[in-house]
From Swiss-Prot:
Annotated InterPro entries: MFS, MFS_dom, MFS_Efflux_Transporters, MFS_trans_sf, Sugar_effux_transptr_put
Protein name per UniProt: Probable sugar efflux transporter
Organism: Salmonella typhimurium (strain LT2 / SGSC1412 / ATCC 700720)
GO MF terms held by the record: carbohydrate transmembrane transporter activity; transmembrane transporter activity
Family from the record: Belongs to the major facilitator superfamily. SotB (TC 2.A.1.2) family.
Gene name of the encoded protein: sotB
Cross-referenced PANTHER family: PURINE EFFLUX PUMP PBUE (PTHR43124), SUGAR EFFLUX TRANSPORTER (PTHR43124:SF4)
Cited function: Involved in the efflux of sugars. The physiological role may be the reduction of the intracellular concentration of toxic sugars or sugar metabolites.
Residues in the Periplasmic compartment per record: 36-49, 102, 157-168, 230-245, 296-300, 354-363
């Protein structure tokens, strides 16, 4: 099914609007990382107890990505986007009104449902809406939207929360989503479902050892990162003894470094994806091991955050490129699985960080995170040696 030809300007506008949507969806997933202390204070809870919200959100996305993708596989994509945006916006209004922690968690589950569907269809939609011959750039734009959520979305969300209260942050995200929805309604044509894959494509994907090995690598390395990253805001304030303002600056540095990672990957990713991902995982190991020693100084923490931000962006982009290259015949199913597996890692990391903080010491989150990071490094070296060509991006 082809889309009626439109001017390149309109085609790019459609892709840019999708990238803005990607920015909003990722901002809301990560913004609680910068608001944990404030939310805990307003509900008279410990920060580590509130952190369980991150795990619940991530695991709902993980569990629901594939079922929702299959349930909606025959649904016209424009209508599906409108429905999931309405759910997303309504859930943010509930977050804003949340009168206790349980209601806040319920609102986050609603957002996670919308998130699960959005990420399983977005990559293939961007490819369909892109101007002729600009598929790679369209995907790169979506990845940029995702990256900017870490760079700008999370720190801005934290600043808004700091000065106007965490509820205002969620309300603002909901309003941003409403404006984006109105743009999508105006810009998008009808988009009949295509190339979405079905349950039939699952056994096919499971029989691809290179792809399955990548999924294992994804869950292990993401668990490592989020063990420490989920609690970086309370770590900076409670362990390092630094100010709330510096915690905001650090999140900004960490996110901003992601842009450098994105540029590095854009330049070298097509030819050297395997080497780049391996180097980035090694860099992540070093950053996690040095997190506590670096906590003695603002400058050391800032420098460490630059390398940490570069590493995690290269890892994320590298995985995405490889998954799409290994499953061109079932992009939606492969990306739904990837999104699910990525979120299993986020939830697992946040849970490990939560348990370490509650039952041991928050100061140990870097060391504990380094354990799965080391395992990921060994696994990456092994699988990239076994499938050196298969795992490079293939032209399709």
């Amino acid at each position: 099914m082809t889309i009626n030809p439109v001017s390149r300007k309109v085609a790019w506008l459609r892709v840019v609007t999708l990238a803005i949507a990607a920015f909003i969806f990722n901002t809301t997933e990560f913004v609680p990382v910068g608001l944990l202390s404030d939310i805990a204070e307003s509900f008279h809870m410990q920060t580590a107890q509130v952190g369980i919200m991150l795990t619940i959100y991530a695991w709902v996305v993980a569990v629901m990505s594939l079922p929702f993708m299959l349930l909606t596989s025959q649904m016209e994509r424009r209508k599906l986007l409108i429905y999931l945006f309405v759910l997303f916006i309504a859930s943010h209004v509930l977050s804003f009104l949340a009168w206790n922690f349980t209601v806040l968690v319920i609102s986050r589950i609603g957002i996670a449902f919308a998130h699960a569907i959005f990420w399983s269809i977005t990559a293939s939609l961007a490819i369909r809406l892109a101007p002729a011959g600009k598929r790679a750039q369209a995907l790169s734009l979506i990845a940029t939207g995702t990256a900017l959520a870490m760079v700008l979305g999370l720190p801005i969300g934290r600043v808004v929360g700091q000065y106007f209260g965490w509820r205002t942050t969620f309300f603002a995200i909901g309003m941003g989503a409403l404006i984006t929805l109105l743009c999508l309604i105006k810009l998008l044509p009808k988009l009949p479902s295509e190339h979405s894959g079905s349950l039939k494509s699952l056994p096919l994907l499971f029989r691809r050892p290179a792809l399955m090995s990548l999924y294992v690598l994804t869950v292990v390395v993401v668990t490592a990162h989020y063990t420490a990253y989920s609690y970086i805001e309370p770590f900076v304030q409670n362990v390092a003894g630094l100010s709330a303002n510096f915690a905001t600056v650090l999140l900004l540095i960490l996110g901003g470094a992601g842009i450098i990672g994105s540029l590095v990957f854009g330049k070298l990713g097509n030819r050297h994806a395997s080497s780049l991902v391996s180097i980035a995982i090694a860099l992540l190991v070093v950053c996690l091991l040095l997190l506590l020693p670096a906590a003695e100084s603002e400058a050391h923490l800032a420098i460490l955050s630059i390398f940490w931000g570069i590493a995690i962006m290269v890892i994320g982009l590298g995985m995405q490129v490889k998954v799409l290259a290994l499953a061109p015949d079932a992009t939606d199913v492969a990306m739904a699985l990837f999104s699910g597996i990525f979120n299993i890692g986020i939830g697992a990391g946040a849970l490990v960080g939560n348990q370490v903080s509650l039952h041991w010491s928050m100061s140990a989150i870097g060391y504990i995170g380094a354990i799965p990071a080391c395992a990921a490094l060994v696994w990456a070296v092994l699988i990239f040696r076994k499938w050196p060509v298969t795992l490079e991006e293939q032209p399709h």
